């Protein structure tokens, strides 16, 4: 299937195998009129010059099938503490070489991010030196200050604020403030519409704790990349946000092209 046949723009201008996308969904989402199966993901990665994409879906076994089939695709375990056996499933999948952390969506799954039921999972992530990407930007469960409670309780955990507050300036500023107070908190850019806030985050929080994410297929990847490019950052810092920071966080080294062996 050609790029045109699956609805991708005809040109992008991005070098091949360069970007690292910290936030991608796979699956069918009829409510949003979008979908991303394995073949489409493979073509999307190639088309946009994405060297590696972190993908997830509430059905973790489906994600496993996708990442095993698609070069450049890596899984984040969807962790829902309301589901019996969620911890055991997470531990099993985190042993898989293509799973590099967890995704938490307290808004969708209706739990506080610092619920004690989550704590054993975070302890496991700390032991493995793996991050948690947490949806951030909506009441009642995903405000940045609620997620901060988890980051404070586990200062050795690597906590990524997905969407860095999303579309509300109060929550965006709050996310930057939370990251400023907590050196274990990272900011991820997808779905956050204010391009200048990306540069502000880099300036205030530091150049190594802001990550590019697209939220594909819900957001168009080229638009999300362009936000970073026009944010006011220098070219070196644009490169750091678009790829190097995620390589460091997920792969273990900012110059690595795949995860460093876990021993």
Give, region by region, the residue ranges found by the protein language model:
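Divalent metal-dependent hydrolysis catalytic cores, especially in the metallo-beta-lactamase
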Residues: 22-25, 32, 36-61, 72-80, ...
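Conserved, mostly hydrophobic/aromatic
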Residues: 23, 45, 63, 93, ...
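Histidine-centered divalent metal-coordination motifs
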Residues: 23-27, 105, 135, 163
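Active-site environment of divalent metal-dependent phosphoester hydrolases
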Residues: 27-29, 60-62, 82-85, 109, ...
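A general structural detector for well-ordered alpha-helical segments in enzyme core domains, enriched
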Residues: 40-44, 62-66, 89-93, 117-121, ...
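Active-site gating/metal-coordination segments in enzymes
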Residues: 52, 60-136, 181, 185
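Catalytic pocket-lining loop regions of alpha/beta-barrel enzymes
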Residues: 114-212, 261
